[in-house]
């Protein structure tokens, strides 16, 4: 008899066994992840297994065979993870703590709410209790909310919702009660931050800046544009469009507004504080409330803003005195500066970081207001430069780098209560851990790893954050300020899907370009058996300054391939992040040689180290830069591949340099503009190697992708069809550079999996 069974037979109670229908289905008798007798207690998250001496002798001997019988179907029913699981999983985000760290609030998106539609609500958990009670829903079922924040006294939670028809700010007692609408502005509130005393908000909204503080003016102008008989728009400068949106003249602008008293009428007026700056605050398209911060005294707001400068004909430089500007340099410069904005909107903005021509971001004040912490790059025009951690003495305006020897790019800044340390996450050797940085010495200590940590926040002695891995989407975790006592507040993907078997993964390394150490990951198929071989999905990440590491993606998720019976190989080639800035820099102006050498050597090394990889049945897949590499490989390294999948890739470098919107990217990566350095664009241009294409290819592109316009995909498909190569084109009229809509994601994965099955089986 197994030891676990003897323990049960001896009458010892197994406590804290998770019910099979609620999460990790661990049987108290056999210790297996199976459906067992404990499944009958599905109504509670934890149960006690009764000592068998309390049962009759006949029942005692009946229990163990029952456990065996119920275990077998569970094991046999194990299946792989697929896209329908992925889009149906809950998604948690935005952990927020009360000031004393005793209460946690977080957002959870559910695929189906009470009205049958996806909805994101707020949930809360008392962290002072150690029971297994699940988090409690805070906001009403069916409401869509985001951006939670807690009041200074910890009694009220604030959030944004479009319940009224436009996105406005709401408040709700943490103890329970109905939400109260606090703002009734004529435009959407895009982001906000509470003032230190909780009586005001700084918020951002997209407005016409000549409207000043009159929010109704923007609403009227938009109505006039909508009702105009002619649809044409005349532009005299860039951006014409950005990411997935055409420029209609609005700028993200910061405002300050008083909040009404409890039960008071929603406020409709606000004072613009950044309208005199001809830039977006926060930046488009992804800026948020981490781009601005209140001073502790509430007298000012510091914001990261890129202010475009005029330029003269042909030079691409600032206009000379007397020269007529022909546009502005916003699309090809990354000079974001920190501006101090008067919260009353009276004093002129002050540039605090004018001496740095590169990117300054993420301002955070010390509690006494004497020090301003922020992140800064050093090289203008390079979006993937290292973000160093900076400390500015507010009185003198002098700054110093806190950890100059720490060769990682900081993701955010969270200050410790005593002001002696800060917390930040960063890519690091194929993961994204949480680090603690000593402000005086610059010493960096990794606190939480084993996956990817995001959204850290600190209050009292409590850290809260989300963490994910190659086997699970985000979970909310809490720990002490040293990263100890780690506790999961929400369930993992495995607990939410007990019938799913996820593919195991392992990191490996090899010598790549320049004999440097290069890292990669291999994910086994869900149904892996020793001695068998499996077809391979070879995934190539985008960026190119990015990483395919130990993290979860709701778009490019290796488990969706492992769940179909494929092994997965991913290589962090030169240019990837988390291996030092020199490693990241190595790809610029070398898109087609150094990374390709890493991919080639990585593919060889993976096959040598993992005998279950069937190198004769392999397809390569990539998006964005990964899509560029797929096009490049089609003409320069097509021998190993039975098929290729290209999503939103660069097909023609030269036309990309003219058609993309963020010109600084193409100009940095190719060594200048297409007319000044045409050789830089043609050196590794996939379009010049179409004559060698022969491998079947699936091309995917979205109409709203203005980063790599749809014509790139159409041109590639035209070449494939004209050459008579087996090919398909999957087109999304309503998606941008990413496929975000759940139904479209299902179609994307079904089409890709069908393509793989056609060419390498499974």
Give residue spans per PLM region.
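Non-catalytic accessory segments flanking enzyme active sites
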Residues: 96, 202-204, 227, 231-236, ...
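Residue-level detector of Asp-centered blade-edge/turn motifs that repeat once per structural unit
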Residues: 99-100, 152-153, 196-197, 296-297, ...
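Hydrophobic beta-strand positions that form the internal "hydrophobic ladder"
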Residues: 101-104, 154-157, 201, 301, ...
């Amino acid at each position: 008899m197994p030891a676990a069974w003897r323990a049960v037979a001896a009458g010892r109670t197994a406590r804290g066994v998770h019910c099979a229908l609620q999460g990790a289905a661990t049987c108290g008798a056999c210790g297996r992840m199976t459906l067992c007798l404990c499944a009958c207690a599905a109504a509670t998250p934890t149960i006690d297994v009764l000592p068998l001496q309390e049962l009759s002798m006949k029942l005692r001997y009946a229990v163990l065979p029952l456990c065996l019988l119920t275990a077998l179907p569970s094991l046999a029913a194990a299946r792989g993870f697929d896209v329908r699981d992925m889009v149906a999983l809950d998604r948690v985000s935005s952990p927020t703590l009360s000031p004393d760290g005793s209460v946690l609030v977080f957002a959870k998106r559910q695929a189906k709410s009470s009205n049958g539609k996806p909805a994101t609500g707020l949930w809360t958990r008392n962290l002072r209790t150690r029971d297994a009670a699940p988090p409690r829903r805070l906001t009403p079922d069916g409401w869509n909310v985001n951006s939670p924040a807690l009041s200074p006294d910890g009694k009220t939670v604030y959030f944004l919702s479009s319940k009224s028809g436009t996105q406005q700010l709401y408040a709700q007692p943490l103890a329970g009660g109905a939400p109260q609408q606090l703002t009734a502005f004529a435009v959407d509130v895009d982001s906000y931050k509470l003032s230190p005393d909780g009586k005001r908000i700084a918020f951002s909204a997209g407005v016409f800046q000549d409207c000043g503080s009159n929010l109704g003016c923007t609403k009227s102008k938009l109505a006039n544009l909508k009702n105009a008989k002619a649809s044409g728009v005349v532009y005299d400068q860039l951006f014409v469009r950005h990411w997935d949106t055409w420029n209609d003249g609005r700028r993200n602008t910061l405002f300050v507004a008083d909040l009404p008293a409890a039960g008071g009428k929603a406020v409709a007026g606000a004072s613009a504080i950044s309208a005199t700056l001809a830039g977006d605050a926060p930046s488009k398209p992804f800026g948020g409330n981490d781009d601005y911060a209140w001073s502790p005294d509430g007298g000012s707001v510091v914001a990261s803003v890129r202010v475009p400068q005029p330029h003269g004909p042909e030079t691409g430089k600032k206009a000379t005195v007397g020269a007529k500007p022909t546009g502005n340099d916003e699309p090809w410069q990354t000079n974001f500066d920190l501006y101090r904005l008067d919260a009353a909107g009276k004093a002129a903005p002050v540039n605090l970081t004018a001496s740095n021509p590169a990117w300054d971001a993420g301002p955070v004040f010390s509690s006494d207001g004497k020090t301003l912490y922020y992140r800064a790059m050093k090289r203008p025009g390079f979006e993937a430069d290292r973000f160093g951690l900076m400390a500015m003495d507010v009185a003198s305006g002098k700054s110093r780098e806190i950890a100059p020897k720490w060769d990682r790019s900081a993701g955010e800044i969270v200050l410790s209560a005593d002001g002696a340390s800060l917390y930040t996450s960063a890519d690091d050797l194929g993961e994204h851990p949480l680090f603690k940085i000593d402000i005086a010495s610059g010493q960096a200590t990794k606190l939480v790893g084993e996956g990817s940590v995001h959204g850290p926040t600190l209050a009292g002695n409590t850290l809260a954050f989300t963490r994910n891995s190659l086997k699970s989407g985000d979970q909310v975790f809490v720990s002490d300020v040293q990263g100890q006592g780690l506790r999961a507040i929400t369930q993992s993907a495995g607990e939410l899907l007990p019938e799913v078997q996820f593919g195991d993964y392992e990191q490996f390394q090899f010598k790549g370009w320049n004999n440097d150490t290069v890292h990669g990951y291999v994910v086994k198929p869900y149904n892996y058996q020793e001695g068998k071989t499996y077809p391979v999905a070879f995934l190539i990440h985008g960026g190119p300054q990015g990483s395919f590491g130990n993290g979860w993606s709701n778009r490019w998720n290796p488990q969706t391939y492992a769940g179909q019976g494929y092994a997965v190989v991913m290589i962090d080639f030169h240019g990837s992040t988390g291996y030092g800035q020199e490693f990241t820099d190595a790809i610029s102006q070398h898109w087609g040689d150094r990374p390709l050498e890493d991919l080639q050597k990585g593919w060889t090394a993976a096959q040598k180290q993992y005998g279950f990889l069937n190198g004769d049945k392999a397809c390569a897949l990539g998006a964005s830069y990964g899509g560029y590499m797929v096009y490049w490989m089609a003409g320069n390294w097509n021998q190993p591949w039975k098929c290729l999948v290209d999503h939103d890739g660069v097909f023609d470098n030269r036309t990309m340099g003219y058609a993309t919107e963020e010109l600084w990217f193409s100009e940095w990566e190719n060594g200048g503009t297409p007319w000044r350095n045409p050789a830089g664009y043609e050196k590794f241009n996939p379009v010049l190697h179409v004559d060698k294409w022969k491998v079947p290819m699936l091309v995917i592109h979205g109409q709203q992708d203005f980063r790599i316009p749809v014509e790139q995909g159409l041109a590639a498909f035209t070449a494939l069809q004209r050459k008579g190569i087996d090919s398909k084109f999957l087109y999304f009229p309503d998606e941008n550079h990413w496929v975000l809509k759940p139904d479209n994601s299902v179609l994307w994965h079904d089409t890709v999996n069908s393509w793989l099955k056609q060419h390498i089986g499974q």
